[in-house]
């Protein structure tokens, strides 16, 4: 699985508008990251996804957390126990 995850991280970073990507487990353990998102962000990203999920009563509704700034967006979503964050530059 680790090699597959590493390949997905590399493939994601090939998009010129993406400057960072991070995958974390539900405990906030960094599973892999590239670019602007690093190990120090893993816990916060995991907690943001968990808290967003608590805002809905529908367990099939998987929220996307979007942090917006003048410099770009960080989109965070949890799937099957893995939370993915993508940092995309503003176009």
Swiss-Prot record:
Job of this protein: As part of the Ragulator complex it is involved in amino acid sensing and activation of mTORC1, a signaling complex promoting cell growth in response to growth factors, energy levels, and amino acids. Activated by amino acids through a mechanism involving the lysosomal V-ATPase, the Ragulator plays a dual role for the small GTPases Rag (RagA/RRAGA, RagB/RRAGB, RagC/RRAGC and/or RagD/RRAGD): it (1) acts as a guanine nucleotide exchange factor (GEF), activating the small GTPases Rag and (2) mediates recruitment of Rag GTPases to the lysosome membrane.
UniProt organism field: Mus musculus
Record bears the keyword Hydrolase: no
Subunit structure: Homodimer. Part of the Ragulator complex composed of LAMTOR1, LAMTOR2, LAMTOR3, LAMTOR4 and LAMTOR5. LAMTOR4 and LAMTOR5 form a heterodimer that interacts, through LAMTOR1, with a LAMTOR2, LAMTOR3 heterodimer. The Ragulator complex interacts with both the mTORC1 complex and heterodimers constituted of the Rag GTPases RagA/RRAGA, RagB/RRAGB, RagC/RRAGC and RagD/RRAGD; regulated by amino acid availability. The Ragulator complex interacts with SLC38A9; the probable amino acid sensor.
The name this protein goes by in its record: Ragulator complex protein LAMTOR5
Positions carrying N-acetylmethionine: 1
GO biological process annotation, one example: regulation of cell size
Top-rank taxon, per record: Eukaryota
Alphabetized UniProt keyword annotations: Acetylation, Cytoplasm, Lysosome
Main location: other
Protein family (similarity comment): Belongs to the LAMTOR5 family.
Pfam families xref list: LAMTOR5
Location of the protein in the cell: Lysosome; Cytoplasm, Cytosol
GO CC annotations, alphabetized: cytosol; late endosome membrane; lysosomal membrane; lysosome; Ragulator complex
Disulfides per UniProt: none
